[in-house]
């Protein structure tokens, strides 16, 4: 994680869009809305593009995307507290650990309009959640595994935050989807969004668990770290890899056939639709808020046949 925060591409994008880990709000009369992520990752580049598009349609607002200095509950909470102090009118957050952040999130919700994304916190006073159904995404991962491994096998999963709702729901969804099949998800290893640790978890598993025939990367960077560890060990193609999200390494693996397929989310839409939803809500228009406060943006499976078209569309959304 620390190395990714220093990543030049993320920093450059942050400077270009006015994104940072600080909570400085622009000194003008426009209300500010903030999109707060759970840690530095290329996964959020699409969300940056979504915020940028929404900004073009919301000239009466300042829109910002904020990266915490580290993927930590305390650091993320401090960032949101600083944003509230600076006068931000609405915050959309991917909480690092919703289960242990109820009090902190409720504090923010009492001071500004709070929305969640990516990993919901339904036990809080958030207005609404906009993002994926992580259970459904997990079930799609199971479909990938069953198609790639008709004779069955043992899968080992890797994820950033074991305690986060999005991780728990994806894992449970995959287990549900594998029920009755010959495939078992035997364990999931966490890394606290530490890139070096993520790769080492895979390397250690290759030594300690030679009977594993499938690896699942539940967070956006996990599949690239799986790919790199398998490549370095000369085992690409001998272990089935099930991916999540659309890191370039993951999409490259799908194209070459070393990643069976990947379940992709739509963070661009979370940010684009989410910022517009917050703006409407602050103007008194609550028509976009469903009764249960859940706005689900569907996930989809990207395989070898459609990876090129998907990658081209992703680049277009990001303005590349």
Positions of the model-derived regions?
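Bacterial N-terminal signal peptides that target proteins for export
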Residues: 1-12, 21
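A residue-level marker of the well-folded mature domains of exported/periplasmic proteins
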Residues: 3-6, 26-320
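C-terminal segment of classical bacterial N-terminal signal peptides
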Residues: 16-25
């Amino acid at each position: 994680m620390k190395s990714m925060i220093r990543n030049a591409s993320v920093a450059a994008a942050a400077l270009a869009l006015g994104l940072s880990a600080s909570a400085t709000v622009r000194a003008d009369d426009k209300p500010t809305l903030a999109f707060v992520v759970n840690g530095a990752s290329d996964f959020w580049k699409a969300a940056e593009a979504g915020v940028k598009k929404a900004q073009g349609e919301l000239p009466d607002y300042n829109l910002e995307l904020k990266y915490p200095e580290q993927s930590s509950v305390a650091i993320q909470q401090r960032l949101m507290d600083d944003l509230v102090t600076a006068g931000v009118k609405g915050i959309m957050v991917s909480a690092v650990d919703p289960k242990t952040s109820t009090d902190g999130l409720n504090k923010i919700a009492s001071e500004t309009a709070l929305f969640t994304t990516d990993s919901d916190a339904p036990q809080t006073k958030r207005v609404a959640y906009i993002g994926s159904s992580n259970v459904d995404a997990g079930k799609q991962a199971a479909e990938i595994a069953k198609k790639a491994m008709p004779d069955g096998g043992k899968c080992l999963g890797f994820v950033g935050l074991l305690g986060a709702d999005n991780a728990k729901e994806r894992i449970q969804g995959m287990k549900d989807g594998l029920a009755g099949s010959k495939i078992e998800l035997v364990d999931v290893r966490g890394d606290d969004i530490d890139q070096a640790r993520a790769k080492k978890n895979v390397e250690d598993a290759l030594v300690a668990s030679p009977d594993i025939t499938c690896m699942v990367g539940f967070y956006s960077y996990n599949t690239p770290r799986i790919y790199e560890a398998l490549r370095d060990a000369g085992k690409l193609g001998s272990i089935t890899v099930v991916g999540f999200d659309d890191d370039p390494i993951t999409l490259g693996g799908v194209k070459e056939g070393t990643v069976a397929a990947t379940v992709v989310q739509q963070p661009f839409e979370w940010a684009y639709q989410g910022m517009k939803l917050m703006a409407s809500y602050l103007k008194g228009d609550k028509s976009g808020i469903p009764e249960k406060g859940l706005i689900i943006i569907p996930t989809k499976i990207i395989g070898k046949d459609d990876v090129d078209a998907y990658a081209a569309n992703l680049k277009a959304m990001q303005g590349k």
